[in-house]
Amino acid sequence: MTRINLVPPAELCDQHLLAEHRELTRIPNAVAKGKFSLKGQPSDYKLGEGHVRFFFNKLMFLKKRYDLLHEECLARGFQVQYFWSTELPEQADLWLDYQPTENALKLNRERITLRMPAKARFTPRKEAI
């Protein structure tokens, strides 16, 4: 599973924050290796089948998201590594941004609530960014 959330990272519990920070890089890594296809790509954000494929051409969104996740992890005092791929293609059609719709945010928040750990942790930020 590769989760890409849409809500601000500050809203995520520690478990979801760290998991997304770790999993998000799977998409740019696949693109860097040429192991992706835009065929059958959904036109709208979705969960489940097609979730990852939706983001294959949204590297700008993923980069911004990863930077926000990384900053939030550091602000909470987590020791995390920065693993954004430096070998991504420069094709403009792969570097699209994405502005989540209200419906996409609603779907994402519902999924986060559904998957909230029984003992969710919310470490307070140790520094303002």
Give a label for each model feature:
Residues 1-129:
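Extended, charge-rich alpha-helical interface modules
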